[in-house]
Amino acid sequence: MITVPAHRVKPFGVEFFQASFSAKDIDRLVKFEVLGYSGAEEPPTKVKQRANRARVNWEALEKRIGESETAYQRPVIRRKIDELVSYYRDCKDAGTLPAIPGAVIITSEKRFTFTPMASQHDLGLLQIPEEHGVLRVLDGQHRLLALHALTQAGENMGIEVPAVLFDRLDAR
């Protein structure tokens, strides 16, 4: 299990958690998956690889992305990831802006365990099964894929990723 400090929120009876993860934890725990293409829809054509400023290793990155008809995400937009890789590097160099200011939204089919602090019922420690792919991205795939690309390139960005986590959410 991985344990992170968390804030438990339960509006309208739907429980979720707010937490922060290291880039390393995100890379270990998140499964990237895009919607599969079946029936009348055609898969997106592969864009011819060209040199770019971000220098993303697309072959390695695309091996990390699964395809499923039950996935939450649309296909990956390469340009967006290239731009985010450059943005993360600029943020690191400038040291003035958070690289990921908005929370990503993550779901899991596995249950989390929340242990509240003695004095606060909504603040505590969240335990998440430590398995590759236990978390799936509902919103924020491009931000996390750009971070993954940098990690694979050997760049330690030292980024903390704010996240909203659901362990019982059916997004459909």
Where are these regions (language model features)?
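N-terminal extension/subdomain marker
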Residues: 1-100, 106-115, 124
